[in-house]
Amino acid sequence: NTQRAYWLKTLHQWHWISSAVCLLGMLLFSVTGITLNHASQIESRPAVTARELQLPPELKALVTPDTSPSSPRAPLPARLADWVDTQLAVDVRGRDAEWSDEELYVSLPRPGGDAWLRIDRESGAAEYERTDRGWISYLNDLHKGRHTGVAWSWFIDVFAVACLVFCLTGLFILK
């Protein structure tokens, strides 16, 4: 009887702790479920930011057509990635760029918008464009887990485990 009381108390504790995590997740997913279901009725005006730059000669030499990497998808050279970070406040380190004969293209998807960087390999002209679709789009993308990164993936996993713990402890408490 003492052992049963111990397990019942432990189950109650796990149940209320997991319910707190579930409550946070359910609030977010409930609201974004409604916004996703009515996406066509929620007007959004994307904000687009565009910048044009010219690569310095020493960096242009890193991307000329005769300096292609062995694969058509490869990261930008480190010095070029550092320059992009300094000039545009955009971290492209480790991201694969599409290397064609004419240009380099780096896709930069993110929740609630997207961005891209294009560098003309002949002239060294660089174009950067960032689109922000607003906070509702941001939350909707979190709901779908689109372009959200490792931290959000971990949150989704923790939320799923908390839901399982909540459900299972609830069933055992009923027993």
Language-model segments: which ranges?
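Charge-dense, low-complexity intrinsically disordered segments
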Residues: 8, 70-71, 129
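Membrane-proximal low-complexity regions enriched in glycine and acidic/polar residues
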Residues: 41-105
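Extended, hydrophilic extramembrane loops/domains of integral membrane proteins
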Residues: 108-163
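Internal alpha-helical transmembrane segments
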Residues: 1-48, 153-175
